[in-house]
Amino acid sequence: MGPERTDLPGYEIQEVLGQGGFATVYRARQLAVGREVALKVDSRVLSTPRDRQRFLREVTAAGQLSGHPHVVPVYDAGVLADNRPYMVLELCPGGSLGDRLHRQGALPAKEARDIGVGLADAVAAAHASGVLHRDIKPGNVMVNRYGGVALTDFGLAAMPRPGRELSVTREALTPAYAPPEAFHMADPSPAGDVYSLAATVYALLCGRPPHYPEDGTQLSLAELIVRHTWPYADLPGLPPAFNTALRHALAAAPAHRLSDAGAFRE
C-alpha cells in the first residue's frame, strides 16, 4: 500500500524518499524560500493523548537541538487537515549511514571514529538539555549535502520529568541497537543512549551490529536478548583505548556501563 496523498500549503511535494512503519518522508520544495526540504509525515492521526504526547515530544526534542552541527535541523512542524502530524527538516541527500553500510559495508576505522566523536557530542548536548534519544542507530544518522553527519528522528525521545510516562513498547525498539534493559521495559537513561551510540560505532567498524553473526544470519528477538549479555570481544586492529571505550559503553548492565556521552567521545 502506498503512502496517503499529502498536501501542505506552502510546499510542493516532489517524491517519496522513504517509507517506514510509522512515517513517510518526502522530498519537497518550500516555496517561500525556494528550498528543498525533507517532509516527514506520520502515518497515524493524533487521535489519542499518547499520540499527541509522542509528537510534541519529538518536536520539542528536535527543536531544542536544531542548532547543533550534528543534529538534523527542524524548520517547521504541525498537523495536516486529516490530523496526521508532520515535520519539515533539512534535506540530507547523502541518505543515512544505514544505507551506506548496506551498500558498501564497514567504514575505515578513522572515519568511524570521527563520526562517533561528532555523534557523541550531539548526544552529550541532548543529555545536557534533558533529552534522551532512545533510537540511535545508523539508519538515524544522515549525511548532509556537505558530507557531514547528523542525528535525526527523535520520535522516541524523552525529556525526563517526575511523573512523566517514559515507557515504550518493544515494537518501537530497534533490537540490534537497543540497550539490553530496554527489552525488560526499564526506565530509559543516558546510559541506554550511550549503549546505542557505541553499538552504532561498532556497526560502522564491522558492518554489522554487536553480537550479530559474521555470515549475516538473522537472529530472533529471544536469541538477541541472550547475546546482549555476552561480554565485549576486542576488535582486532583498533587502538587499545578505542576497544576500552567500546567495552565500557557496551556493558550489558547499566550500572557497569559508561553513562556519559562526553566521556565516550573523549
Where are these regions (language model features)?
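Conserved catalytic-loop aspartate of Hanks-type protein kinases
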Residues: 193
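A short, aromatic-enriched beta-strand patch in the conserved N-lobe beta-sheet
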Residues: 76-78
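Activation segment signature within eukaryotic-like protein kinase domains
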Residues: 115-116
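Protein kinase catalytic-loop region centered on the HRD/HxD motif
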Residues: 119-131
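Protein kinase glycine-rich loop
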Residues: 14-20, 25
